[in-house]
């Protein structure tokens, strides 16, 4: 993809989570799905999201800490990330001794873990948490319904921060410390981040 000659690494396959969708679009999808299904459908609040991600654990992740081997649990920035450095007319991963590699192999990563996915992988490729939920902390991060204000909610937010929406979880390009069940990120509702998708809550009417 760096040479604009091939599609590169596919991130739009049916089994992969949706990305590059704004909060506005994700919320509109939930509303439309609710009308079609007759159920209450919505994005989770960040409190709901964290409760589900932790699955009863008080640690960084349901499976352990930021130093745990996440290879069979979540798709995060691991040793496969080095293969994002590519070269050639039909791009292939650069050799380890390629002098240009240092200019492309710049993403921070955990080199002693291999989760066997370069970018986003098929949903449910890794072990579920104790409550049966997949990919809560990895693969792609997720929009929530919540405004980006101080959390837990103790103070009033100013207009600038309240305009943003909370994103929770990590992704294939983020290290564990940026992917824990407590980490918060924020984007404006019209933004379409390349590593952010969403999941929904479905309740009977």
Range-by-range predicted roles:
Residues 3-183, 192-194:
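Functional-site microenvironments in short loops/helix caps that host divalent-cation chemistry
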Residues 194-205:
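Short, structured beta-strand segments at or near domain termini in extracellular proteins/domains
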């Amino acid at each position: 993809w760096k040479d604009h000659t091939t599609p590169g690494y596919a991130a739009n396959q049916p089994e992969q989570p949706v990305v590059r969708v704004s909060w506005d679009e994700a919320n509109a999808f939930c509303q439309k799905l609710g009308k079609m299904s007759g159920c209450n459908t919505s994005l989770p609040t960040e409190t709901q999201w964290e409760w589900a991600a932790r699955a009863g654990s008080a640690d960084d992740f349901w499976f352990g800490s930021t130093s745990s081997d996440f290879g069979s649990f979540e798709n995060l920035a691991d040793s496969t990330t080095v293969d994002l450095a590519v070269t050639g007319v039909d791009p292939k991963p650069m050799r380890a001794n390629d002098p240009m590699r240092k200019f492309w192999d710049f993403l921070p990563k955990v080199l002693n873990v291999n989760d066997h996915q370069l970018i986003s992988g098929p949903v449910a490729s890794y072990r579920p948490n104790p409550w049966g939920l997949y990919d809560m902390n990895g693969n792609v991060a997720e929009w929530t319904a919540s405004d980006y204000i101080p959390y837990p909610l103790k103070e009033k937010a100013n207009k600038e921060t309240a305009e943003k929406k909370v994103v929770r979880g990590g992704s294939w390009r983020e290290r564990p410390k940026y992917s824990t069940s407590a980490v918060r990120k924020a984007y404006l509702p019209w933004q379409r981040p390349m590593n952010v998708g969403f999941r929904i809550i479905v309740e009977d009417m």
